[in-house]
Amino acid sequence: MENTQENPTSQNPTPADEAARQAAEAASGEPQDQARQPAAAAGEQPAQAQPAGAEAALAEAQAKLAELQESFLRAKAETENVRRRGQEDVAKAHKFAIESFAEHLLPVMDSLEAAVAHSTDDLAKVREGVELTLRQLTGALEKGKVVALNPVGEKFDPHRHQAISMVPADQEPNTVVAVLQKGYVIADRVLRPALVTVAAPK
């Protein structure tokens, strides 16, 4: 028959164990069982506070992200509006670029139509009408910043003049002696160079 009696020393502390426990309690000022309980409770508090702080930080980050997304969408929409308005302005500028210039040419057209409708054998009147029309056309061109080049006496400029020939002349070499065909510039940009003859070197 097996012996089921437990060792009494496993349940009942010996005098030596009791003396060691009492010495430890005296050194700490409180029983060891009570000292372990607050420590365990103190260790649980950060674990409870940490999730609450993390949730608050996550909520703040999500709110900031939503704000940035909204700002981005507004900026994108505004950029698209500016781009569309710019395209419309460019299209209008191309479409009506010569509107003002064409308006200045209308009086010239009126004068030419009137001259054709009114026939006369008086050459003096015909010449007078042509001169008037020419003045109107010149004025219309000048309003459009188109100016004639008539560089007689000026130094030859290959950017504004086209030399047809060089002729003996009293002027300094490379001086424009005669203009065979006027040139024209628009806002300092050459539309057509003037055809000229130039003084030859002596």
Curated annotation (Swiss-Prot):
GO biological process, one term: protein folding
SS bonds (residue pairs): none
Disordered, as annotated region: 1-58
Feature: compositional bias, Low complexity: 21-58
CDD domains: GrpE
Main function: Participates actively in the response to hyperosmotic and heat shock by preventing the aggregation of stress-denatured proteins, in association with DnaK and GrpE. It is the nucleotide exchange factor for DnaK and may function as a thermosensor. Unfolded proteins bind initially to DnaJ; upon interaction with the DnaJ-bound protein, DnaK hydrolyzes its bound ATP, resulting in the formation of a stable complex. GrpE releases ADP from DnaK; ATP binding to DnaK triggers the release of the substrate protein, thus completing the reaction cycle.
PANTHER family in the cross-refs: GRPE PROTEIN, GRPE PROTEIN HOMOLOG, MITOCHONDRIAL
Protein name, entry field: Protein GrpE
Organism: Paraburkholderia phymatum (strain DSM 17167 / CIP 108236 / LMG 21445 / STM815)
Gene name, Swiss-Prot/TrEMBL: grpE
